[in-house]
């Protein structure tokens, strides 16, 4: 409503299930809309944005993929969406583009990740690139990751990549701390582990990491964790 009051045109792209009442906008691009007729509904947010870019460029999907395919592939892997259909093609193409990328920011990130000059798989992206990009938002502002991906100065890119590395290391340390405290709680009250749903809480647990910690526990114990 504020954007409308300011006389601006709003276009929304999303990949989540929309509410029954949609926001006021000139266009809402979301494959999960009730009136959507697109054949593939499992794109991540960047995949939807890529579709919009292609549409704004006269429907030239090949050009959009050539320009932004590696970014969309990284996002697709990082968001852990279903790697079938269009997503599978997007990741296959994007990994090839990533191996030859000229994006200064990405090159700095690849070097910091120890992946520069190596062949890429969805696994190397998921465990090497994605955590460092995600760390920007988990420990600080996602703006740092955006600045890195848009950066054209090698020195500045190296500094931004180093900052993401520091945040990722901080994320790892916080994850270990949370898991250790959970282990202590479980040791003090063994009956907790016999519940079908496990609920843990702690002072000062970072909101950007508790979801990761819950996922780790789910992998270890095959139980739902809150």
What are these regions (language model features)?
Residues 7, 31-32, 47-50, 149, ...:
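Short, low-complexity, polar/charged sequence segments that are solvent-exposed and flexible
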Residues 10-13, 35-37, 52-55, 101, ...:
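Glycine-rich loops and low-complexity Gly/Arg-rich segments
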Residues 15-16, 32, 41, 206-207, ...:
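Histidine (H) residue identity feature
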């Amino acid at each position: 409503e504020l954007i409308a009051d300011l006389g601006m045109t709003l276009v929304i792209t999303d990949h989540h299930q929309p509410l029954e009442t949609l926001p006021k906008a000139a266009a809402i691009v979301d494959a999960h809309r009730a009136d959507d007729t697109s054949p593939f509904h499992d794109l991540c947010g960047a995949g939807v944005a890529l579709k919009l870019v292609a549409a704004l460029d006269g429907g030239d999907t090949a050009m959009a993929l050539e320009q932004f395919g590696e970014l969309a592939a990284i996002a697709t892997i990082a968001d852990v969406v279903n790697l079938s259909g269009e997503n599978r093609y997007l990741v296959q193409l994007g990994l090839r583009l990533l191996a030859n990328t000229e994006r200064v920011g990405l090159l700095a990130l690849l070097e910091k990740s120890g992946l520069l000059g190596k062949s890429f798989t969805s696994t190397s992206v998921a465990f090497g690139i994605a955590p460092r990009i995600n760390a920007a938002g988990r420990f600080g502002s996602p703006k740092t990751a955006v600045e890195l991906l848009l950066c054209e100065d090698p020195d500045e890119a190296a500094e931004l990549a180093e900052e993401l590395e520091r945040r990722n290391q901080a994320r790892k340390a916080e994850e270990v701390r949370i898991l250790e405290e959970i282990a202590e709680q479980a040791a003090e009250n063994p009956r907790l582990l016999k519940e079908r749903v496990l609920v843990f809480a702690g002072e000062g647990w970072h909101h950007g990491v508790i979801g990761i910690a819950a996922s780790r526990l789910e992998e270890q114990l095959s139980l739902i964790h809150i």
